[in-house]
UniProtKB/Swiss-Prot annotation:
It is found in: Chlorosome, Chlorosome envelope. GO terms for cellular component: chlorosome envelope. Belongs to the BChl C/E-binding protein family. The C-terminal extension may have a role in proper incorporation of the BChl c binding protein during chlorosome assembly. One of its GO terms (biological process) is photosynthesis. This is Bacteriochlorophyll c-binding protein. Residues 49-80 are annotated as: Disordered. It comes from the Bacteria. A bacteriochlorophyll c binds at residue 25. It comes from Chloroflexus aurantiacus (strain ATCC 29366 / DSM 635 / J-10-fl). One of its GO terms (molecular function) is bacteriochlorophyll binding. InterPro entries: Bchl_c-bd, Bchl_C-bd_sf.
């Protein structure tokens, strides 16, 4: 069959070209994802200080003085 020989020959070339195109596209995608992640990290660090460093306890969301006594005050009001 002539069609089968042509298909086997062209499919190998298409696979090779597609592999090269996929490698280039994946490199571009990974670069774009890394740039987006860096930009999002930079925006979060500038807009919400302490969100990326919430583990050390210096965030406005993680450590505020009202979080220390408000649950105790509500519980003591119901427990007396």
């Amino acid at each position: 069959m002539a069609t089968r020989g042509w298909f086997s020959e062209s499919s190998a070339q298409v696979a090779q070209i597609g592999d090269i195109m996929f490698q280039g596209h994946w490199q571009w995608v990974s670069n774009a994802l890394q740039a987006t992640a860096a930009a999002v990290d930079n925006i979060n660090r500038n807009a919400y200080p302490g969100v990326s460093r919430s583990g050390s306890g210096e965030g406005a969301f993680s450590s505020s003085p009202s979080n220390g006594f408000r649950p105790k005050r509500i519980r003591s009001r119901f427990n007396r």
